[in-house]
Amino acid sequence: MEKTWRVEFRNVGSCYFPQSRVDCHYTINPQHTWASNDWIGLFKVGWSSVKEYHTFVWAVAPSSYKEGTSVNCCVNFQASYLPGPSAQQYQFVYVDGKGEICSCSAAFTFSAPKPLEELVTLEEEGQGEEVGEDMLLVIPRAQLLQSRLQECLKERAELLQALEAADQNVEREKGRRERDRGSWEHTRKELERKIDDLKEEVREYREKVEDMKKKQKEVEDLGEALTEEKRALLAQKEANEQRIRELEEDIKILTQRGLERETDLERMRERAKKSAAQKREDEDEHKNLKLKMEQTEKELHSLSAEFQSLRSSLAQRDTHALQLRDTITTLTHKLNSAHRKEAANELALNELRSVQERLNVSEHCVETLRGELRDMVAQRDSAHAELHQARLQAAQLTLQLADASLALREGRANWAQERETLQQNAEIDKVRLERQNDEIQQKEEMLQKARMEREKAVVELGREKDCNRELKASLRVAQKEKEQLQTEIQEVMEYSRQLERRLEVLSDCKWSETALLQSSRAESPLLSDSEDENPEALQDTHSSGPLNHYSLCEQPQSDLLLPATPPPSPRHPSTVVISQPAPLSSPHQPSARSHTHSSESEEEYEAALSGGHSSGEETALLLPDNRDTTLGELAESPLW
């Protein structure tokens, strides 16, 4: 079974040429983790150590490589580092950074190419006139490959140039698109700004409506909250009353228990008195028993002393009996006395036995007295314990009674305070409810007013919209009238130029008639002196209206009305102003008065434009009549 490698070599040939580079293809399996210090070595077959490599290259991995994935890679062994042609077999070995062998390739050799392998046969058609004659060319493969490589490089350069041109076109297209996008963004922003303004207005109206709705909802919520609070207060009041009733029942139960405990305490006191009397009796009896015990102990001591004396006397008698036994043989004559003494001894022994029995009885009495004393001491201790427990229970009962009475007093005080606070809270709630009812009424009135104002605002908004529509329509009409006036002004200007040319021709004709001009020359200085002497009249004539001047850059109505006015007689001072040839000869150089008249005429022109449709109609009606009258009057009027 073949060993499974963590790296697999692919497309390994059996023979390579040392004059060209060698490509080593391999696959990194998921079991192997690639590191930057992994390398691939070219080893001779039969190698024993990783240091016996002929040459090596660092193993590479693509930038998108991730651990735990399978990836195909390729490295190049340059021709300068490859071994020469020989029969020695080589193999690729993949070594990781730790020096472990990850894979070995199949064996291959390096051999020089044969001469026939370097030649390539090409078939070319003949360029002559004879058809069917072909040429066979035999060239080296390296030359063929070199020519193909040059063609490929040339194609690559052309493709790169085309790519650069395409990139430039793309950049220009991007710039144009960016400019178009900027213009569109500008228009879009303007439209969005307008839309935002309209949305802002709509939002403001909606916010107003929402505020009104919120206020109304707050008022309704406040009313509901007040009703809920009122219900909660009523429920709390009922709960407090129920609690007060329960506390009263608890107080009754506690008072009854206190009375029962007082009776139990009286009973305990009586029992304590009885136990104290019994204790006194027991103490007296104990004292008597102690006295009796002391007496019996004294008797016992005396009896023991007697017993010791009797024992000593008995010992003496025994010794004497022994002496008598020793001397019984010699003292036979004293036998009777000995028998008497023996009888006396027997009596003494009987007395001793009786004393011993009395001693045993006294000891038994002492034991019984001791047991009784122990029982009495135990009874006394139990009585003391019971008395102590009774005292503790009495103290606890007194404390509980005091606590119950204190709790009863506190409960009554709290109940009174809670009752007062509840009454005060009820009164405050009543006042609050009244205030809130008043506030609700006021807010309802305010809400009605707000609704009325909102309806008025909606109506005013509709009116404003209608006014805006009317203003836009009137603005369109005024624009049209302005265009008509401009066309009419151009026509009047053209007509005035024609009149000026005619007046110049007429003035030349009149100046040629010297005979008729002598009288007019004599009268003209007088008239000019009269103008100098009376400038107010001249100013009045100029300020009387826009009909008595020849300014061409003024209101069109003044130019139209100028020829329509009949020329006054030469005796009037206004004739001097009208018949002056200076404005006609130099119409583009008006005096200060003409400037003032032109400014006034411009103001009147603005007033005429703001006048609307009526002024335009009047101007349109006056134009044909003025033209006809002007032509007739110019034909009849003199030059001066």
Swiss-Prot record:
One of its GO terms (biological process) is positive regulation of transcription by RNA polymerase II. GO terms for cellular component: cytoplasm; nucleus. Residues 262-288, 519-640 are annotated as: Disordered. The keyword Coiled coil applies. InterPro entries: CALCOCO1-like, SKICH, UBA_autophagy_assoc_protein. Its main location: cytoplasm. Residues 576-589 have a biased composition (Polar residues). Residues 278-288 have a biased composition (Basic and acidic residues). Residues 141-212, 246-346, 424-510 form a coiled coil. It is found in: Cytoplasm; Nucleus. GO terms for molecular function: transcription coactivator activity. Keywords: Coiled coil, Cytoplasm, Nucleus. May function as a coactivator for aryl hydrocarbon and nuclear receptors. Belongs to the CALCOCO family. PANTHER family: CALCIUM-BINDING AND COILED-COIL DOMAIN-CONTAINING PROTEIN 1, SKICH DOMAIN-CONTAINING PROTEIN. This is Calcium-binding and coiled-coil domain-containing protein 1.
